[in-house]
Amino acid sequence: MTIEQIANRLTELCRQGQYETAQKELYADNATSTEPEHAPGLQSVSGKNAIIEKGHQFQSMVEAVHSSTVSDPIIAGNYFSVAAVIDLTMKGMGRMTMTEVAVYKVADGKVVSEEFFY
């Protein structure tokens, strides 16, 4: 797949809330995921299975998702980024709006890294 195809497919799946499908389909086995140092309860991990498990961990912290939007991807070289806005209720933390930018690196037709900024 080209970077354009990967970026568009990942965006499509994220808009549908199918994050795990995106990871299983588009990520390299040795992909990395980097969270900001201030991320509540989430850590940076290496490996597709660890990324999927981190997604499960995040979902276990969510009481309800009220709405979410994901921007069209912006592509530059081997990287693409998307912005997301999620209106959600976190367990024990109440309702909040989470805004983030995600930057993805692609190599050999797979996502090899993701990094989140929020």
Which residues does each PLM region occupy?
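A short hydrophobic beta-strand element
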Residues: 76-86
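Hydrophobic/aromatic beta-strand elements that line small-molecule binding cavities or substrate pockets
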Residues: 68-73, 85, 99-104
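A solvent-exposed, acidic/Ser-Thr-rich amphipathic alpha-helical stretch
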Residues: 5, 20, 24-72
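Short, cysteine-centered beta-strand-loop-beta hairpins and adjacent loop/turn segments enriched
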Residues: 88-96
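Short beta-strand edge/turn micro-motifs at domain boundaries
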Residues: 99-118
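Short beta-strand segments enriched in hydrophobic/aromatic residues
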Residues: 27, 86-88, 102, 118
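Short, aromatic-enriched amphipathic alpha-helices that serve as compact interaction elements
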Residues: 1-19
